[in-house]
Amino acid sequence: MRIEEDLKLGFKDVLIRPKRSTLKSRSDVELERQFTFKYSGQTWSGVPIIAANMDTVGTFEMAQALAGFDILTAVHKHYTVEEWAAFINTASADVLKHVMVSTGTSDADFEKTVQILALNPALNFVCIDVANGYSEHFVQFVAKAREAWPTKTICAGNVVTGEMCEEPILSGADIVKVGIGPGSVCTTRVKTGVGYPQLSAVIECADAAHGLGGMIVSDGGCTMPGDVAKAFGGGADFVMLGGMLAGHEESGGSVVEENGEKFMLFYGMSSESAMNRHVGGVAKYRAAEGKTVKLPLRGPVGNTARDILGGLRSACTYVGASRLKELTKRTTFIRVQEQENRIFNSL
């Protein structure tokens, strides 16, 4: 046993220090980025935000809507091959280039992903998703996926420390997903005592990944557009959002009514709700590590997407970054004990 004395920080612990800017308008900021990935060799351009691969966020409908904003969607792994085929038959090439195919690490997951990718060559992204990216089985699966799909861009996770961020990259991942426990409906930290403050995880993993020519996606912990800006400022190449995109018409959650008001259910993918729906319940040897919440219906996701992108543009103007690519090198974080004046938050 040992204790690390270094303080680790989350998004709530910092603000971005404003700097001199020559920008005249938020409209001068370019949010689109262009990446060429280490192993796949694919070049992609767009806004590097990803809708999370949760079945109450990463839906086909969400992919259709967010493609119009140049945003990616990691479509959840619980759609059947037949449902994928129906979606591909109606989706445009532009939508498909904004889609990531999510998979677990079982043999059945692998075979299903093989079938999905065979449906259309425009599906260029694979998202390998496990809660604990510290297992040897996960790293071996990444290597297997790279061998099977040499031209696909592979995103894999989750990890939170620099040394383990390197492992999936060395095994064939182009992008590593960073985050254990920061999600709004994740209870891993309270059930297990395991986790890592998200901003520090992003900073440390970005340093490790970039040294190997890889990239990272900050997954979880964002509650507002300012957190998205902080994630990019900390070195994230992509930012994945779950709770911020939940509760919309395109989100796919079940709608319930209470006292004449309608709500949409949103739950973590390790919650009892998710396991009851997809695997027949919580196995006797494990505990649920997620919760279910009821969100007031939020309408079309387009309004939220505009708010996020607008906040991101504004953050760039405050530090003089004319392009999102410049935000990291123009970011100085200051530690704080308050984020906002909350006097009217309860009204």
Curated annotation (Swiss-Prot):
SMART domains per record:
IMPDH (SM01240)
Q: Kindly give the Gene3D superfamilies that the UniProt entry links to this protein.
A: Aldolase class I
Q: Which SUPFAM superfamilies match?
A: Inosine monophosphate dehydrogenase (IMPDH)
Coiled-coil ranges per the record?
A: none
Sorted keywords for this record are: Metal-binding, NADP, Oxidoreductase, Potassium
Q: Which InterPro entries match?
A: Aldolase_TIM, GMP_reductase, GMPR, IMP_DH/GMP_Rdtase_CS, IMP_DH_GMPRt
Record: residues binding NADP(+) = 108-131, 216-239
- EC numbers on record: 1.7.1.7
Q: Report if keyword Oxidoreductase is assigned.
A: yes
Q: Which domain of life is it from?
A: Bacteria
Q: Please name the PROSITE patterns in this protein's record.
A: IMP_DH_GMP_RED
Which GO MF terms does the UniProt record name? GMP reductase activity; metal ion binding
A single GO CC term, please? GMP reductase complex
Q: Which residues bind K(+)?
A: G181, G183
| Record's catalysed reaction(s) | IMP + NH4(+) + NADP(+) = GMP + NADPH + 2 H(+)
Q: Which residues form the active site?
A: C186
An individual GO BP term = purine nucleotide metabolic process
Q: Name one Pfam family in it.
A: IMPDH
Q: Quaternary state and partners of this protein? A: Homotetramer.
Question: Family per UniProt?
Answer: Belongs to the IMPDH/GMPR family. GuaC type 1 subfamily.
Which function does this protein serve? Catalyzes the irreversible NADPH-dependent deamination of GMP to IMP. It functions in the conversion of nucleobase, nucleoside and nucleotide derivatives of G to A nucleotides, and in maintaining the intracellular balance of A and G nucleotides.
Please report the name of this protein according to its UniProt entry: GMP reductase
Source organism:
Salmonella choleraesuis (strain SC-B67)
* Name of the gene this protein is made from: guaC
